[in-house]
Amino acid sequence: MKVAVNTFLLFLCSTSSIYAAFALNSDGAALLSLTRHWTSIPSDITQSWNASDSTPCSWLGVECDRRQFVDTLNLSSYGISGEFGPEISHLKHLKKVVLSGNGFFGSIPSQLGNCSLLEHIDLSSNSFTGNIPDTLGALQNLRNLSLFFNSLIGPFPESLLSIPHLETVYFTGNGLNGSIPSNIGNMSELTTLWLDDNQFSGPVPSSLGNITTLQELYLNDNNLVGTLPVTLNNLENLVYLDVRNNSLVGAIPLDFVSCKQIDTISLSNNQFTGGLPPGLGNCTSLREFGAFSCALSGPIPSCFGQLTKLDTLYLAGNHFSGRIPPELGKCKSMIDLQLQQNQLEGEIPGELGMLSQLQYLHLYTNNLSGEVPLSIWKIQSLQSLQLYQNNLSGELPVDMTELKQLVSLALYENHFTGVIPQDLGANSSLEVLDLTRNMFTGHIPPNLCSQKKLKRLLLGYNYLEGSVPSDLGGCSTLERLILEENNLRGGLPDFVEKQNLLFFDLSGNNFTGPIPPSLGNLKNVTAIYLSSNQLSGSIPPELGSLVKLEHLNLSHNILKGILPSELSNCHKLSELDASHNLLNGSIPSTLGSLTELTKLSLGENSFSGGIPTSLFQSNKLLNLQLGGNLLAGDIPPVGALQALRSLNLSSNKLNGQLPIDLGKLKMLEELDVSHNNLSGTLRVLSTIQSLTFINISHNLFSGPVPPSLTKFLNSSPTSFSGNSDLCINCPADGLACPESSILRPCNMQSNTGKGGLSTLGIAMIVLGALLFIICLFLFSAFLFLHCKKSVQEIAISAQEGDGSLLNKVLEATENLNDKYVIGKGAHGTIYKATLSPDKVYAVKKLVFTGIKNGSVSMVREIETIGKVRHRNLIKLEEFWLRKEYGLILYTYMENGSLHDILHETNPPKPLDWSTRHNIAVGTAHGLAYLHFDCDPAIVHRDIKPMNILLDSDLEPHISDFGIAKLLDQSATSIPSNTVQGTIGYMAPENAFTTVKSRESDVYSYGVVLLELITRKKALDPSFNGETDIVGWVRSVWTQTGEIQKIVDPSLLDELIDSSVMEQVTEALSLALRCAEKEVDKRPTMRDVVKQLTRWSIRSYSSSVRNKSK
């Protein structure tokens, strides 16, 4: 093509001097000049556009008037690319230009405005950029302007408003922005206005109501705000109205008194409130009505029954209540009826069975009850029936097997009983069948894949029995097979080659026999779950050929033999669980090559030999379970396992000392090395501050228990038993020695008998040692107090040299200029300091002028923050103390605060449940660290989303804890001078008191957790000042028990996943326990961490499984 272009242009150059000789008129010359801007010209044009012609009137795409002047240029979809040249202005008689469906780029030439006779412009479906030229306003004869599907930007040109007879404007699919002109109503002859899929903002202009000729109004997929203008009721000729996917609010103001012409109304994905206008029944031509994902409420109007032409009704994702109106059965043209995710109750009206053309019936996630009317099962046109997450009951009728068009049937999480009709699938092209979490009995129908269309079969959590139909193993279209938690028995099916199965879960049944080697044919499978069965024999090495496998769970069976080394070929494997079997031999060292592995569980088998060093090299491993085997030798170095959270090596034959680099595992929460032959001291554990569970019992450890571990002596004292030489290191005065029924104090000596010291001698030695220690302590304290100030001043002044970091920070912020302010709080102003692209800091300035003891308070904050280190707490980088103020330097968090993410981004930033759960877990870890792992403990005093900062990975970091009071070691709460905290987050006991406690922080955390779940503020405007988020959630939860009425609507789709539903429900319950009025009913933050992480471990496999359904 490039050769053709060059040849054509060369031809033009060589013939430029002969235009006159052959008398090619000026229009022809102008057209040839346009081609010089094209980079790709089709051969049809190069052959047709001949410079030797006298006129271009016979050229391809060109039409002329009677005087041989070009009046039409139509090159639509010819495959031309290049720029649209300014020479177009030479075509003075041009009335119509159509260049749609090509590859034009660059700007639309402003010279197009010189073609004063133009009536029709179509430049759609190209790649034009830049603004729409204002010069187009000079085209007073223009009637049609089509610029859709380009990359145009900038505002709507107001010059177009002066074109008197403009009828159609198509600007769809660009990047136009700014407000729609308020006087757009001046375009009085407009019939079509397409402004959808742009970035327009501001309100919908009320002047649109002046354009009574308007038939099509598309404003969808913009950033429009405010209410719909009531003036739209004036548009009696309107046929299409689409304002979906904006941020419009308020009641729907349309009375629909004069709506005889309207065909389609789409209001979806806005924030409309109130009910639907009853006047909708007047719109007798209405074919489609959509208002899903708004905040509409009240009953569904029965007037829809008057709309006999209505074929599509979308009301999903609102707050509609009451019963489904039986009048809907009169909508004889209905094809698609979607009322899901509301609060509808009662039975499904049998009148819906009269909708003989219905193809899609979606009523899921409501409160519907009773049996599904038999008439529904007789709608022969039905393709998709989605009734899941209701309270429906009864049995499935045999009639359903005659639904020949049925493609998808989802009834999960109801109370259906009886046998699944055995002919289901034999007469239809069924692709999806989901009956999970019901009470079905009997056998799996044998013909579900007889039409070779089945893609997803989900029958988990029922009471099905018998074997898996053999044809499922040969169902090449099957992608998801989930039969978990039934009473199925027999052997596993054999799988043929060229299978498309992606997800395979038969766990929790009674399957027996070997794992078939044919599982190796599932080349696309990503997850295999066969746990909790009675499978026997060896693990087939053919599983090693599953290169896409990510999850393999064979636990709780009676498998024996070795663990095949071929599994190391599954390079994407992230979970391998073969625990609770009879496996033996050594653990393959090749498993260390699985770089994506996050969980390895081989516990409760008979593995022997040493632990392969290669297993301890994975920096992604979170959970390593090797307990209950016959492993021997030393524990290999573990320092590379930086992400490890749980390590279980218990009940083996390990010896030697704990690895010295065990203390480097800063994320470790659970450690169990009990019932081994390990020796040495526990000194390496003293630096692991993240531990929430430890068991080192029944070993040969000696020496003192590190102070950081003594907290476990009360919660789990037996975790230290069976170590006869282990002791507690008591203070010299002996008055504060931790009590333990398991361990003795380290300074307690048994009577040595003859030749030993007398009791008096021992007492004198102890007394002398105590006096010496006291004197040494007093002398050290004197030196410390005497030197503290000078040392501090030296440290501070040393930071203020010309090349110091302080100097650079002040320079970057122009001496703390207000334009760098990114936040202000009760304790200071925060600035953003950018030293370089990879060195961005937050600088907090605390002013002391007029504040008594300000510098002392500053030192307290600095000392507190400076010694606290945790991945979920903001880290102090530097500090400087000056006469009038102090500066603290932190790492800048680019995602701002949790408050910003939840409430200030527009449009709201998408946050799935996994992200919210991680934020909740991280925040809990940080707060638990402050409460239990700092010595003395720290009460934050103002936990709220604004004090939870999020890094680039949305990992939470608690800030502003440096001003917290330091708890006395022997107290649980401390009186402060003033009531501190934020309204809405303060615990009830703190509203009129100055006492702050760890329990107060727990209450505040509960409020934050509710905000994560609901995406509502603690004092949300929707509460109308009558309550706070705790009261609102408790009221709705008590009255309805429906999580869907509480959670952020954007999470509703995820709640389809039963494991997510379970986690969100339990998180809500935990949040309410944290926010109990009575202090002693609240859990500790350590309890909160345990529960949140327990969900993560317990739901790890099931959540992965359900997300893949």
From Swiss-Prot:
Give the stretches traversing the membrane: 765-785
Q: Which superkingdom is the protein from?
A: Eukaryota
The EC number(s) attached to this protein equal 2.7.11.1
Q: Which PROSITE patterns match?
A: LRR, PROTEIN_KINASE_ATP, PROTEIN_KINASE_DOM, PROTEIN_KINASE_ST
Q: Phosphoprotein as a keyword?
A: no
Q: Which catalytic residues are annotated?
A: D942
Q: Which GO terms describe its molecular function?
A: ATP binding; protein serine kinase activity; protein serine/threonine kinase activity; transmembrane receptor protein kinase activity
Tell me the ranges holding the LRR repeats. Answer: 69-92, 93-115, 117-140, 141-162, 165-187, 189-209, 213-236, 237-258, 261-284, 309-331, 333-355, 357-378, 381-404, 405-427, 429-451, 453-476, 477-499, 500-523, 524-546, 548-569, 572-595, 596-618, 620-642, 643-666, 667-689, 690-710, 827-850, 958-981
Keywords tagged on the record: ATP-binding, Cell membrane, Glycoprotein, Kinase, Leucine-rich repeat, Membrane, Nucleotide-binding, Repeat, Secreted, Serine/threonine-protein kinase, Signal, Transferase, Transmembrane, Transmembrane helix
Catalysed conversion reaction: L-seryl-[protein] + ATP = O-phospho-L-seryl-[protein] + ADP + H(+); L-threonyl-[protein] + ATP = O-phospho-L-threonyl-[protein] + ADP + H(+)
**GO cellular component terms attached to this protein's record:** extracellular region; plasma membrane
Sugar attachment sites are: 50, 74, 114, 144, 177, 186, 210, 245, 282, 367, 391, 427, 510, 524, 553, 584, 648, 677, 695
Tissue/organ expression? INRPK1 and INRPK1b are expressed in leaves, cotyledons, shoot tips and roots from induced and vegetative plants. The highest concentrations of INRPK1 are found in vegetative roots, and the lowest concentrations in vegetative cotyledons. INRPK1b is more abundant in roots than other tissues. INRPK1a is expressed in vegetative roots. INRPK1c is expressed in cotyledons.
Query: Which positions carry the signal peptide feature in this UniProt record?
Result: 1-20
Q: Does the keyword NAD apply?
A: no
Q: Which Gene3D superfamilies match?
A: Phosphorylase Kinase, domain 1, Ribonuclease Inhibitor, Transferase(Phosphotransferase) domain 1
Q: What broad class of enzyme is this? A: transferase
Where would I find the Protein kinase domain in this sequence?
816-1096
Cytoplasmic membrane side: 786-1109
Taken from the record's topology, the Extracellular segments are: 21-764
Chain positions recorded as ATP binding sites: I822, G823, K824, G825, A826, H827, G828, T829, I830, K845
The alphabetized list of GO BP terms reads: defense response; protein phosphorylation; response to other organism
Instruction: Tell me the protein family, please.
Output: Belongs to the protein kinase superfamily. Ser/Thr protein kinase family.
Q: What does this protein do?
A: Possible role in short-day photoperiod floral induction.
Protein's UniProt name: Receptor-like protein kinase
